[in-house]
Amino acid sequence: MDFKQYSPEELKECSMIEVVHSVLGDKKQATTFNELVQEIAQVLGLSQEQVNAKIAQFYTDLNIDGRFINLGENRWGLRSWYPYEQIDEEILPQPKPKKKRKVEEDGFDDYIEEDEDDFDDADVNEDEDDDVEDLDKVLEEEDGDDDDLDDLDEDDDDFAEEELEYDETEEEEEEEL
């Protein structure tokens, strides 16, 4: 479509989408979004402020309109240029086949009785018996510490009794009033 044949009034009535469709049809190759915006601004005589105000709606319209296709890397083309099968090939990256890993043997399956060590009671070291006796002595000493706790419990009981007596005295005084 040759835009020179249109008057400025007729160009202002054209939508940005119509202009892009004509521009891409004339070029017959995919073009980046920024280049498309510059060409629209030039054809329609839009200022940078006007372009900035309309760019979001234009991008939305470009995505929604079924005549256009995004080819990736911000390149746009006409859907009629690409058969359906070719679109899938160009847009989607080819999946790479995954390599199969070899299963490593963990060595647990092979059980050999020769490797098993028999455990005998004779192998127990006598030093371990001494360690147990030392622990018993420490525990007995700690049991003596419980007497101190018992004394503290008795003090708590005495304090609780004093509080009860004090509360009873207060209640009696309140009843008298």
UniProtKB/Swiss-Prot annotation:
| Keyword Nucleotidyltransferase tagged | yes
- Per UniProt, residues of the HTH HARE-type domain are 14-81
Q: Name one GO biological process term.
A: regulation of DNA-templated transcription
Q: Which residue intervals are annotated with compositional bias (Acidic residues) in the record?
A: 106-177
GO CC annotation, single: DNA-directed RNA polymerase complex
**Role description:** Participates in both the initiation and recycling phases of transcription. In the presence of the delta subunit, RNAP displays an increased specificity of transcription, a decreased affinity for nucleic acids, and an increased efficiency of RNA synthesis because of enhanced recycling.
Q: Which NCBIfam families match?
A: RNAP_delt_lowGC (TIGR04567)
What is the designated name of this protein?
Answer: Probable DNA-directed RNA polymerase subunit delta
Organism name: Bacillus cereus (strain ATCC 14579 / DSM 31 / CCUG 7414 / JCM 2152 / NBRC 15305 / NCIMB 9373 / NCTC 2599 / NRRL B-3711)
